[in-house]
From Swiss-Prot:
This is Formaecin-1. Glycans are attached at residue 11. Pfam families: Antimicrobial11. The lineage of its organism: Eukaryota, Metazoa, Ecdysozoa, Arthropoda, Hexapoda. O-linked glycan consists of a Gal-GalNAc disaccharide, O-glycosylation is essential for full biological activity. It is found in: Secreted.
Amino acid sequence: GRPNPVNNKPTPHPRL
């Protein structure tokens, strides 16, 4: 996936 914003996640966000 690509680095996505917190509010809008088009792809599964990585574990931050």
